[in-house]
Amino acid sequence: MKILLNGVGRIGKAILKQLDTNKDFEIVVINEINPYVENIVYSINYDSTYGKYEDKFKIVENNYIQNSTSKIKITNFDSLEKIDLKDIDIIIDSSGKKEDIKLLKNLPVIAIFLTHPNNEADINMILGVNEKDLNPNIHKII
């Protein structure tokens, strides 16, 4: 499944590093409000809390970064609805920014995972508490 990761702060970097070697999920786009790809690469490779990332990313072409397992396009849109989503299956929004849920529901993706609580999400899920309530047929924004 192809993923767009929106935001690479503390949570976004942790998600990126967890999914970087996962063969079932591929982060193909990172959308980050920071317009400087060099800063994004540096913050992924040298995190002040998580430390150095062994499989370092580097800039390989204009707005693309790559390491030994992933090649990822970098965008810096201020809204998810402005991004070309034709090849994206899942959005993980770790930006912390509250998006308009009505707009998100119309995006052409299978699911949108918010890493922050939102009263208007289809379900606010906490592993170990209510994950059994998740129904992929009716819950798109999680």
Where are these regions (language model features)?
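N-terminal Rossmann-like NAD(P) cofactor-binding subdomain of oxidoreductases
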Residues: M1-I142
